[in-house]
UniProtKB/Swiss-Prot annotation:
Subunit structure: Part of the Bam complex, which is composed of the outer membrane protein BamA, and four lipoproteins BamB, BamC, BamD and BamE.
Classification lineage: Bacteria, Pseudomonadati, Pseudomonadota, Gammaproteobacteria, Enterobacterales
GO annotations of cellular component type: Bam protein complex
Protein name per the record: Outer membrane protein assembly factor BamA
Protein's GO biological process: Gram-negative-bacterium-type cell outer membrane assembly; protein insertion into membrane
Family the UniProt entry places it in: Belongs to the BamA family.
Matching Pfam families: Omp85 (PF01103), POTRA (PF07244)
Predominant location: membrane
Signal sequence, renumbered to the chain: 1-20
Superkingdom of this protein's organism: Bacteria
Stated role: Part of the outer membrane protein assembly complex, which is involved in assembly and insertion of beta-barrel proteins into the outer membrane. Constitutes, with BamD, the core component of the assembly machinery.
Key words, A-Z: Cell outer membrane, Membrane, Repeat, Signal, Transmembrane, Transmembrane beta strand
């Protein structure tokens, strides 16, 4: 029998199969070499069973079937009488996968790509796929300009037919663009055209967007930008004939040549609109109106199409089709646009669903909706819902999509997918602040209390100059119409001298309540009443304080410290505007507020205060990682009825929340102390004690940039910026004629300037802000403070 097998093997030398030429009935099937794969599993994958009459073709199919499982490197089928002997060599099992040297590609991305190719821990290793994986990864590096990159798969055998798989990367450096040539341009210079490219052969220091590192994707984007540049200026026949990318022998340099044909400029003769316009032909005609002699403009054509889709989308036509076919007349150099419109079906909203709101109740999200269930789908209302959810500040991001309801021709579901952020915190700790010294803090705050959207806070702070406690509650939807109700109780013991202010102590407590009324999507009004008790003591003879005390009927002595108690009832009113795209770390939109406060009859003081705050975000690039931020804060207050506004209600500037680079509250008028005879105390006056003023103006210009060396996972919780701050505080009641030798504190032109960098982090304990700023313009008595940081909220 052994001789028979040997003879058959020699006759069929080179084949992986040894069997007789005639068919036979299989009596038994035996496997040799199985380790990980069970016999039963192997038998299930075979087309041959015990008792079958098999032919040569059946046995060949058996080999192919076993190979197809991916479990075996080698398969042989032998015949021993009527028995089949299947000899296999199993592929090794992958015990681990590691990566080395990959700086441009993350491990997670590599694992996903390997799994897509069937390479994962615990699975059999198909060595034939490794070369294609190596080549695919190298092709990726070539596409980003790293032509010296190599990828090598290293397989290390382990006991029990296992292996370790390690991908070793040698990335090298990106090839630098040496020259970009545009051939065939006559209407525009190469410099003008290349100015719109991201890839450049010469990058000026001020151009933060340009790059000399070659990337295939960026080149494709630049070619599209070149095409759009010509099409937007009437060159309807513009074509890019060819693009050559040449590599230097050392693979370190790139030469790019772009061959173009400009053609002639064409004018728009008119727009011919046809098709199903769902009864909105008049509106569509207005959107497609062109001026006589107007140049053909590709961007305008795209804008027309988008505006038509938006128009139809507002009225429930969720999936309109707009096709534009330009008819080019080369003789007259004119273009007629033939636009065919199919509005499609009008869709109604069956359901609005929310996904990802594990904490926030559905009702909290649903009340922000402007799209109603059962009504036709309105694209504007759907987008407004997304904007309003983002504006709540409860979510890191919000996405929305419309899903067609299967089996219906005119129904959709609107699905909002949210990712919640941590809106609450409990903390007890000890910290240090540049403005407050040693600080003890305990607090519980929840901006989305139990998922209801209510804001509940209990906070306390103890530092060198302040002991503060507060309990507050705000219900943003006190009524179903969006009327908000807020209330606050507070206690504050403030030692001004320790805060670099003039000497006095104020122990105050009070409460207030506020109602807010929405006017429209972006505007709201508020009104409120409040009570505050102020207990002033340890007031040293000082011009601003003595001036106030005399206005309220007190006659303080210049030789001793004064005290005074005041009970005030206040009415507040305000207007607010908000169209920011997000509740935290906005990237677009504006926010502004105008607020006023006035004392009511029965108060010991008679004064009013007005403040205006605004901030506007202007994104520079499409993905909004580069943003310009402008901020303004204005304030003015004064007394009436012969009384002055209390000095402790003065405006201050300087510090991390105002003009950075200056010490907190240090900008503006300084304390003028008096001797016992009423003259100016020259020894104490001219120091650094700030008293503030009844008028203030602060402005800031900031460039928000991507945070370097930070992964995308943390990009949404970090923000980096460079800034320039300016601010001034002045006293309109200052009498310069009385104190001619002192600075004129009534001047608004004593503006301080600073410039620096800032880093903000939305930490689990609250916002953490670091800044480093250098004063550019300062005055005598100003204190600078280059490095500043702030944790959480300030009062």
């Amino acid at each position: 029998m052994a001789m028979k097998k040997l003879l058959l093997a020699s006759l069929l030398f080179g084949s992986a199969t040894v069997y007789g030429a005639d068919g036979f009935v299989v009596k038994n099937i035996h496997f040799e070499g199985l380790q990980r794969v069970a016999v039963g599993a192997a038998l299930l994958n075979m087309p041959v069973r015990v008792g079958d009459t098999v032919s040569d073709e059946d046995l060949s199919n058996t080999i192919r079937a076993l190979y197809a499982t991916g479990n075996f490197e080698d398969v042989r089928v032998l015949r021993d009488g009527n028995n089949l002997i299947v000899q296999v060599k199993e592929r090794p099992t992958i015990a681990s996968i590691t990566f080395s040297g990959n700086k441009s590609v993350k491990d997670e991305m590599l694992k996903q790509n390997l799994e897509a190719s069937g390479v994962r821990v615990g699975e059999a290793l198909d060595r034939t796929t490794l070369s294609s994986i190596e080549k695919g990864l190298e092709d990726f590096y070539y596409s980003v300009g790293k032509y010296n990159a190599t990828v090598k798969a290293v397989v290390t055998p382990l006991p029990r037919n296992r292996v370790d798989l390690k991908l070793v990367f040698t990335e090298g450096k990106s090839a630098q663009i040496q020259q970009i040539n545009i051939v065939g341009n006559h209407a525009f210079s190469s410099a003008e055209l290349l100015g719109h490219f991201q890839l450049r052969d010469d990058v000026p220091w001020w151009n933060l967007m340009a790059d000399r590192k070659y990337q295939k994707q960026k080149l494709a984007g630049d070619l599209e930008a070149l095409r759009s540049y010509y099409l937007d200026r009437g060159y309807a026949r513009f074509t890019i004939n060819s693009t050559q990318v040449s590599l230097t022998p050392d693979k370190k340099g790139i030469y790019i040549t772009i061959n173009i044909t400009e053609g002639d400029q064409y004018k728009l003769e008119g727009v011919d609109v046809t098709g199903n316009m769902a009864g909105y032909s008049a509106e569509i005609t207005r959107l497609t109106k062109v001026e006589p002699g107007e140049l053909y403009n590709g961007a305008k054509v795209t804008k027309m199409e988008d505006e038509i889709k938006q128009l139809l989308g507002r009225y429930g036509y969720a999936y309109p089709r707009v096709q534009t076919q330009p008819e080019i007349n080369d003789k007259d150099k004119t273009v007629i646009l033939h636009m065919n419109i199919d509005a499609g079906n009008r869709y109604y909203v069956r359901q609005i669903r929310f996904v990802g709101n594990d904490t926030s109740k559905d009702a909290v999200l649903r009340r922000e909706m402007r799209q109603m269930e059962g009504s036709w789908l309105g694209s504007d209302q759907v987008e407004q819902g997304k904007e309003r959810l983002n504006r709540t500040g409860y979510f890191e991001n919000v996405d929305v999509e419309t899903q067609r309801v299967p089996g219906t021709p005119d129904q959709v579901d609107v699905v909002y997918k949210v990712k919640e952020r941590n809106t609450g915190s409990f903390n007890f700790g000890i910290g240090y602040g540049t403005e407050s010294g040693i600080s003890f803090q305990v607090g519980v705050q929840q901006d989305n209390w139990l998922g209801t959207g209510n804001v509940v806070a209990i906070n306390g702070t103890k530092n060198d100059y302040q002991t503060y406690a507060e309990l507050s509650l705000t219900d943003p939807y006190f009524t179903v119409n969006g009327v908000s109700l807020g209330g606050r109780l507070f206690y504050n013991d403030f030692k001004a001298n320790n805060a670099d202010l003039s000497d006095y102590t104020n122990s105050s407590y009070g409460f207030d309540g506020t109602l807010g009324f929405p006017i429209n999507e972006n505007n709201s009004l508020r009104t409120g009443l409040g009570y505050v008790h102020n207990d002033l003591s340890d007031m040293q003879p000082q011009v601003a304080m003595w001036r106030y005390l005399r206005s309220v009927g007190q006659n303080p002595s210049d030789s001793e410290r004064a005290s005074y108690k005041a009970d005030d009832y206040t009415w507040t009113a305000g207007w607010a505007y908000n169209n920011l795209d997000r509740g935290f770390f906005p990237t677009a939109g504006s926010k502004a507020s105008l607020n006023g406060k006035i004392t009511l009859p029965g108060s010991d003081n008679e004064y009013y205060k007005l403040t205006f705050d605004s901030q506007s975000y202007f994104p520079i690039n499409q993905d909004r990682t580069w943003v310009v931020l402008g901020r303004t804060r204005l304030g003015y207050g004064n007394g009436f009825g012969g009384k002055e506004m209390p000095f402790y209600e003065n405006f201050y500037a300087g510090g991390s929340g105002s003009v950075r680079g200056f010490q907190s509250n240090n900008i503006g008028p300084k304390a003028v102390y008096l001797n016992s005879d009423g003259s100016v105390d020259q020894n104490k006056t001219g120091g650094n004690d700030a008293v503030g003023g009844n008028a203030m103006a602060v402005a800031s210009l900031e460039l928000i940039t991507p945070t370097p060396f930070v992964s995308e996972q943390y990009a949404n919780s970090l923000r980096t910026s460079v800034f320039m701050d300016a601010g001034t505080v002045w006293d309109t009641n200052w009498d310069q004629t009385t104190y001619p030798t002192l600075p004129d504190y009534s001047k608004a032109t004593n503006v301080r300037l600073s410039a620096g960098i800032a880093l903000q982090w939305m930490s689990p304990l609250g916002p953490l802000v670091f800044s480093y700023a250098q004063p550019v313009k300062k005055y005598e008595g100003d204190k600078s403070e280059q490095f500043q940081f702030n944790i959480g909220k300030t009062w």
